[in-house]
Amino acid sequence: MGGNQILKQIIAKHLLDIQAVFLRPNEPFTWASGILSPIYCDNRLTLSFPEVRNDVASGISKLVKEHFPEAEMIAGTATAGIPHAALAADHLNLPMCYVRSKPKAHGKGNQIEGAVQEGQKTVVIEDLISTGGSVLEACAALQAAGCEVLGVVSIFTYGLPKAEEAFAKAELPYYSLTDYDTLTEVALENGNIHSDDLKKLQTWKRNPESKDWFKK
């Protein structure tokens, strides 16, 4: 088993153990978009557990060094990506900035906070990737400011087809500490879910906008 797969399993177990991720295949959550989802993820909880927080920061730093060794700046997405970007930037001894979802309505009207420079090679840190829309908007804001965005690193990704398409269209790579497939496998091994639940979870991922998975 490769090092990255071991890391994926460690982070997945952390997220389950601290209940940053809930799996409810029989009592789905409703997302703001109206999608019925068997999973709810709140990676902000990782900040409250020092061991988990350190493993996340170390893991993000490892992925940045491995995939983006030329990085000159770490950018966090507001608000959930900011603390993880700060911790990773500290590990890597790199400058850090953060990107709001839209410019401030007062003051200087900044969307990007921090000292960014033209051509600065930047990696964007996000806590969670679902469709990829919000983090790609942050990438676009950085590009508009003159940064060279190398790619994105996140704690967790659902691995949804819509996200894969969005990143391919933006011509940006992304890497995650762990993912939906790894997490559901770890959940099954740990007894968090049963084999019938796993089938439902796999069906949802293939087409999250359909409610057919819930009827199975």
Swiss-Prot record:
InterPro entries: OPRT, Or_phspho_trans_dom, PRibTrfase_dom, PRTase-like. Homodimer. Interacts with BrxC. One of its GO terms (molecular function) is orotate phosphoribosyltransferase activity. Keywords: Glycosyltransferase, Magnesium, Pyrimidine biosynthesis, Transferase. GO terms for biological process: 'de novo' UMP biosynthetic process; pyrimidine nucleobase biosynthetic process; UMP biosynthetic process. Catalyzes the transfer of a ribosyl phosphate group from 5-phosphoribose 1-diphosphate to orotate, leading to the formation of orotidine monophosphate (OMP). HAMAP family: PyrE. The lineage of its organism: Bacteria, Bacillati, Bacillota, Bacilli, Bacillales. Pathway: Pyrimidine metabolism; UMP biosynthesis via de novo pathway; UMP from orotate: step 1/2. Orotate binds at residue 130. This is Orotate phosphoribosyltransferase. It holds the Pfam family Pribosyltran. It comes from the Bacteria. Its EC number is 2.4.2.10. PANTHER family: OROTATE PHOSPHORIBOSYLTRANSFERASE, URIDINE 5'-MONOPHOSPHATE SYNTHASE. Its cofactor is Mg(2+).
